[in-house]
Amino acid sequence: MNAIHNHLVKQNASLKKDLSEFSANPAGAPMSLQGQISATMTSFSRTLDDYSEIINKEHNKEKKEKAEARLARFREELADARSEFKNLRSAREEKTLEENKTALFGDNPYGESRNRNVNRDVPIQPTYTDLTREEGMQREQSSLNQVGQQLDSFIEQGMAALGDLQEQSDILRSTGKKMRSVAETLGLSRETIKMVEKRARQDKRFFYGGIVFMLVCFYYILKWFS
């Protein structure tokens, strides 16, 4: 039990460290960090389930109560970590959306056209060509930035979906364990009932057999003395 408790302590410390790094810069944190946090939380949850099973098998009352208190504290910290991670992802998505809007509507494509309309009487063709090329490069760079931000947004959505699937997998895994436990309990009860019924039938046979043997004995005794 001490070994798995120490493992939980290490997982909890690693999770807090990653969340602290993510909270320091939600918008600029790499996607790999989010994946690492999701994986750590999933592993942490599974270790807690294993720890709970070990606690249920503990016969020492004092050790069991102490371990249950630790388990409750770890589960509470995991719930807080999930809530914090969700808030950080929401903050990152809002920041990304704001940057996309700024990149999309921040530049005014009519500014240069107005300047050229004001100076249309000036016959300087090279300047017009240079400005057009510069504007085209800016628009191309803006488009590339938008594509990159959209890709980041898609990756974030994929990571969020992966995290949700992992949480659902944990829930299904926990439910499956409970169902197996109930099935095992029912199976044991059925075996016990079958054994009791079998023993009852055997007792009935001995009882009725004893009655028949006693009647036969009475018959021969009466016949002998008569």
Curated annotation (Swiss-Prot):
GO terms for cellular component: endoplasmic reticulum membrane; ER to Golgi transport vesicle membrane; Golgi apparatus; Golgi membrane; late endosome membrane; SNARE complex. It is found in: Golgi apparatus membrane; Endoplasmic reticulum membrane. GO terms for biological process: endoplasmic reticulum to Golgi vesicle-mediated transport; protein transport; vesicle fusion. SNARE required for protein transport between the ER and the Golgi complex. Residues 1-205 are cytoplasmic. This is Protein transport protein BOS1. It holds the Pfam family V-SNARE_C. GO terms for molecular function: SNAP receptor activity; SNARE binding. InterPro entries: GOSR2/Membrin/Bos1 (IPR027027). Belongs to the BOS1 family. Keywords: Endoplasmic reticulum, ER-Golgi transport, Golgi apparatus, Membrane, Protein transport, Transmembrane, Transmembrane helix, Transport. The keyword Phosphoprotein does not apply.
